[in-house]
């Protein structure tokens, strides 16, 4: 993912294609690494924590690469970063309240990065960022509603 962020940031002639392919490949390995850890019995709280932190760092780096590469308006990129982090925070805070939000919302991290990779590859990065803003915003609201509903049910 960091390699795709670098490619996007350099603004290379085929940067959207190369960056998108790198993003798809890194997404595949990100998906597989957790499954391998579970299958081999090598999961740990530290590994889970570091995986989540590096996922967020990589996601922000990708958006910053798009910003530096000039692929989308700065305000859209910043909004995408803010909403993406808020979606993750909403889940983390709900988890701390013993409310599970995995799978809640139409725009989890994998979906957001898939939009960036695929729509970016075909040459429409700014619309891809707009789609990310919309689905991240919807996901944030969905998670807030589900969390509020669960809190209300627990206190009744």
Where are these regions (language model features)?
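A feature for the membrane-embedded catalytic helix bundles of lipid/isoprenoid biosynthetic enzymes
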Residues: 52, 56-156
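Membrane-embedded alpha-helical segments that form the functional core of polytopic membrane enzymes
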Residues: 1-46, 74-79, 124-135
């Amino acid at each position: 993912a960091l390699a795709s962020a670098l490619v996007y940031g350099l603004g290379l002639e085929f940067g959207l294609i190369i960056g998108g392919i790198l993003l798809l490949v890194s997404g595949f390995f990100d998906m597989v690494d957790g499954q391998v850890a579970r299958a081999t019995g090598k999961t740990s709280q530290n590994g889970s924590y570091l995986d989540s932190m590096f996922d967020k760092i990589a996601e922000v780096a990708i958006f910053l690469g798009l910003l530096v590469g000039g692929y989308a308006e700065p305000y859209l990129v910043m909004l995408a970063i803010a909403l993406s982090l808020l979606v993750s925070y909403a889940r983390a805070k709900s988890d701390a309240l013993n409310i599970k939000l995995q799978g809640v919302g139409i725009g989890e991290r994998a979906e957001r990065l898939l939009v960036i990779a695929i729509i970016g590859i075909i040459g429409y990065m700014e619309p891809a960022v707009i789609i990310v803003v919309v689905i991240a915003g919807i996901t944030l609201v969905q998670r807030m509603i589900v969390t509020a509903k669960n809190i209300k049910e627990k206190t009744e």
